[in-house]
Amino acid sequence: MSPHNDAPSPAGSFTQSFTMSFRPVAGSGLRNSSSNTNSVYSESPLNDSQYSSSYSSTSLDTDDHMSRPLVPGVYVPTVCFFDPVTEDLDTATIGTHAVRLAKAGVTGLTTQGSNGEAVHLTHSERQTVTQTTRSALNAAGFSHLPVLVGCGAQSVRETIQYCREAYAAGGDYALILPPSYYAPLFSPASASVIEFFNAVADQSPIPLLIYNYPGAVSGMDLSSDIIIKLSAHPNIVGVKLTCGNTGKLNRIVAATKAGNKPSSLSASPPFLVLGGSADFTLQSLIGGGHGILAGLANISPKACIEIVRLYREGRLAEAQKMQEVVARGDWTAIQGGIVSTKAGMESWLGYGGYARSPLPHPTSNESAKWKEGFRELVALEKSL
């Protein structure tokens, strides 16, 4: 869990030269906000011909771009599966796993997240994973479930490319990390970070969710002030908080409520605020969050869903008891990352395989340890 660091940092002279601009996608229906027509992105808008894609919108089923609002609940960043020998994508298991999660009752799926080993995939492989997931859901009768797609990159240009490819492959929303390679040149509170998200949102064909995960971006931890400011963009619709800061979560929820009135449990909130780890599911809900987007739900979707249900029904003591089991199981996943998660899935579900190299294969002792670490959680999951 990353430290709770929610204080804004002063922007350096390098970042102070940047200005914000909004330029909606043509035909998107996005409202214009105050913009600077001299934006560094305004003179050469990207166009579809600049990118090649394995999938075009004309090859998709009509269900692939139906409206799928984001509603409160449990979202799962799905694991990506590979052939154990060749490390090629195992599309059969990718599709089967997506349907298993849908049948468990999750609210939506995410491809190309940390659990999906996005950093190990090529552009075309990312599209294959997303398209396989969307097609499997549609074929199994779950065409209503939204698919979020990790689209973060180090430049505005490539991030927009990922967003367009995600849309072409059937994705509904883009989950975006802030750029981090040149993090010393700008701070989490700087104009350049704001400019990055706004520039991507202006040209993305799908709405964005901000992904605040300091551990993956050189420690960059976006403040609640920055996230609240970005929430005003019509094409930025939510945030995933893997920082674990429930105080930040509470501030964002309070500032983005429509008319400061709580939204219906079944309605799409004006700005979706999700906890980024299952070990603080209940804490996120108590703080006003709308649910979680958590990797542990690959193993225990029903347990995560049950915590949400118990909380909504006012059965706090029961929810707390279940949260304790989930938190202990999540600690095993946190300690071993995707390696332990896949090992646990292999041990208890009969599939999971290995992460792509250079991540190591677990030793027999490690596999046994992680199997034991998930034992209590799996027993709970099977009881539901």
Residue spans for each PLM region:
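C-terminal alpha-helical cap/extension of soluble enzyme domains
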Residues: 2-6, 14, 18-31, 41-43, ...
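Active-site beta->alpha loop and helix N-cap motifs at the rims of alpha/beta catalytic domains
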Residues: 21-24, 36, 56-219
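Short, amphipathic alpha-helical "lid/cap" segments that border enzyme active or binding sites
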Residues: 91, 95-98, 224, 367-375
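A general structural signal for well-ordered alpha-helical segments in protein cores
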Residues: 94, 126, 130, 159, ...
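Alpha-helical structural signal in soluble globular domains
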Residues: 104, 128, 132-140, 165, ...
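Short secondary-structure transition/capping segments
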Residues: 121-124, 186-189, 221-223, 251-252, ...
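Catalytic alpha/beta core domains of metabolic enzymes, predominantly
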Residues: 199-203, 214-334
